[in-house]
């Protein structure tokens, strides 16, 4: 009895950062998640933090700096140049991000950047947390069913 295993196919599958059921369960157990998205809004990476993003200790700005560190136009628009990025405790790849982001500038660019930032904060739990953390379940269901 021989089993035909295509090593290249398996390697490509693993390298494409497929989201496995264990990853979904882990995300649904996490309390503080920040989603990085493609320019079309599809989540690409879930960054997990053990502590809540807060305004009083400026951790929310540090998380924003990390989230947009590869997008200097957004860093400039949101006045985050002098802020040190806060690295996540863990990151889970959800999908491949091979798209270019449009250059954001002016008042409309600022609004788009803020909208993207405010939609990044998610939670997998249902316990009370600040208003800016939205439920993650909808995003995960959209990815798993695609």
From Swiss-Prot:
Entry's induction text: Expressed in the late phase of the viral replicative cycle.
Gene this protein is translated from: OPG114
Top-rank taxon: Viruses
UniProt record similarity statement: Belongs to the orthopoxvirus OPG114 family.
Protein name in the entry: Core protein OPG114
Pfam family, any one: Pox_D2
Subunit structure: Part of a complex composed of the kinase OPG054, OPG092, OPG100, OPG114, OPG115, OPG142 and OPG157.
Cell location: Virion
């Amino acid at each position: 009895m021989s089993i035909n295993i295509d090593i290249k196919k398996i390697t490509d599958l693993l390298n494409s950062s497929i989201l496995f059921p264990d990853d979904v369960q882990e995300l649904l157990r996490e309390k503080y998640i920040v989603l990085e998205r493609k320019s079309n809004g599809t989540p690409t990476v879930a960054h997990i933090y053990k502590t809540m993003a807060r305004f009083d200790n400026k951790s929310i700005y540090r998380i924003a700096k990390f989230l947009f560190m590869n997008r200097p136009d957004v860093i400039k628009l949101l006045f985050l140049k002098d802020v040190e990025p806060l690295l996540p405790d863990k990151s889970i790849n959800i999908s491949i991000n091979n798209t270019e982001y449009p250059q954001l500038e002016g008042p409309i660019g600022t609004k788009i950047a803020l909208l993207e930032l405010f939609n990044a904060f998610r939670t997998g739990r249902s316990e009370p947390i600040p208003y800016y953390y939205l439920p993650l379940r909808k995003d995960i269901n959209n990815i798993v069913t695609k």
